[in-house]
Regions:
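Alpha-helical phosphate/pyrophosphate-handling elements in metalloenzyme active cores
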Residues: 74-115
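Histidine- and acidic-residue-rich, metal-dependent catalytic cores
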Residues: 86, 93, 145-183, 232, ...
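Inter-helical turn/loop segments and adjacent helix faces that build the functional surface
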Residues: 100-107, 132-137, 156-167, 212
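Structured all-alpha helical bundle cores of eukaryotic regulatory proteins
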Residues: 130-153
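Divalent metal-dependent phosphate-bond-processing catalytic cores, especially two-metal-ion Mg2+/Mn2+ enzymes
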Residues: 2-48, 95-112, 122, 179-334
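His-Asp-centered metal-binding catalytic motifs of divalent-metal-dependent phosphohydrolases/nucleases
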Residues: 89, 113-132, 149, 171-180
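Active-site flanking loop/helix segments enriched in acidic
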Residues: 63-91, 132-139
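Secondary-structure capping and boundary motifs in well-ordered enzyme cores
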Residues: 81-85, 108-117, 141-145, 191-198
Length: 334
């Protein structure tokens, strides 16, 4: 694989957008160097350093994987679970992880945080098809993508020098993601990995449901589910007890119930670490606030008629990485 050593000249800029008008740092996700600089800036106040060499290599490799430049794999062809979807986990995960460290400084260690960051990059790699898999898209693996992500992580991470124990810890954290993670079946090797696994699962839910374009993107999610339904077949769906939505409008109408009964329960079961995202001065959780606004848009039927078609273009190459207004979360002990 050929990677450009040219340093990105894209300058991060603050823009007023979403989350009640709070400021967010917006970075171009086309640049692995920009993403690494953001991680380095975020974790700079911790008393230890992570291995940025391996993190940068992983960022470049996963970007190559999603773009079809990784040996043995096709490009990502799932329009909902894309590269931007993966990178959106960094802000809430990092804020929760740093808050956890400030509460339990002896629990969150350098290697644990490093593997947590790597797990973000790897957690949806199971959607990527291998070369020779020419039927359909990666969406067909929706109900099996976690196992496939674990398999990819176990194959890939040794190339960065990680050992079997590291692979096991990454597997445990990957299994904290998804709609209904079986948390009680995960034998975490340390309290730190358990907490970071919960941080990852929490970030996975909140980062997508708080997306300002979430309601529009549900049509893309339904397209993925539709292919997954067909690939699994009715018998397998029955065994998995998977709810089948009749249309994307049906999916949208069930979303408030999903957030309240399924996602809400999941967030509580993961140690309620979502509370660490609250602003210490106002008590406002900007992620939950945006999720609630999205749910309100559904229940009040204030969704524009044409919102179901999500436009692809320049906006998809940018991702909101961190809110300036939440920087206080990096300084205080919650």
């Amino acid at each position: 694989m050929k990677y450009s050593n040219k340093e990105s000249h894209i300058t991060p800029r603050f823009e007023r957008r979403f989350f009640g008008g709070d400021n967010f740092l917006t970075l171009n996700i086309e640049s692995s160097n920009d993403v690494l600089r953001w991680i380095d800036w975020t974790t700079a106040r911790l008393p230890f350093r992570i291995c940025t060499v391996r993190i940068l290599k992983a960022i470049k490799d996963i970007m190559a994987l999603f773009r079809g430049n990784f040996p043995g794999y096709f490009a990502c062809d799932t329009r909902y679970h894309d590269l931007a979807h993966t990178l959106r986990l960094f802000p809430p995960f990092c804020q929760i992880a740093i808050a956890l460290f400030r509460k339990h400084p002896a629990t969150i260690l350098s290697m644990e945080l490093e593997l947590g960051l790597l797990t973000i990059l790897l957690h949806d790699s199971g959607y990527i098809r291998k070369e020779g898999d020419c039927n359909g898209t990666g969406a067909k693996y929706t109900f099996h993508h976690i196992d496939r992500s674990v398999d990819f992580a176990r194959t890939y991470l040794p190339s960065l020098g990680y050992q079997e124990q590291d692979l096991l810890n990454v597997e445990h954290m990957i299994r904290c993601t998804g709609i209904k993670p079986k948390l009680k079946q995960i034998n975490f090797t340390s309290e730190g990995y358990r907490l970071l696994g919960y941080a990852l699962g929490t970030a996975d839910l909140l980062s997508q449901m708080s997306d300002p374009h979430y309601l529009r993107k549900l049509s893309l999610l339904f397209s993925e589910l539709e292919e997954a339904y067909s690939y699994a077949g009715p018998n397998q769906l029955g065994k998995m007890e998977v709810q089948r939505f009749k249309s994307y409008r049906d999916l949208i109408q069930h979303t408030p119930f999903f957030f309240k009964k399924v996602a809400g329960k999941c967030l509580q079961n993961m140690g309620a670490v979502y509370r660490l995202l609250e602003n210490p001065e106002t008590g406002l959780n900007p992620y939950l606030k945006r999720v609630q606004e999205n749910m309100k848009g559904i229940t009040q039927r204030s969704i524009p008629h044409n919102c179901y078609r999500y436009p692809l273009g320049q906006a998809n190459r940018r991702v909101i990485l961190t809110p300036n207004s939440m920087a206080g979360g990096f300084h205080h002990v919650l």
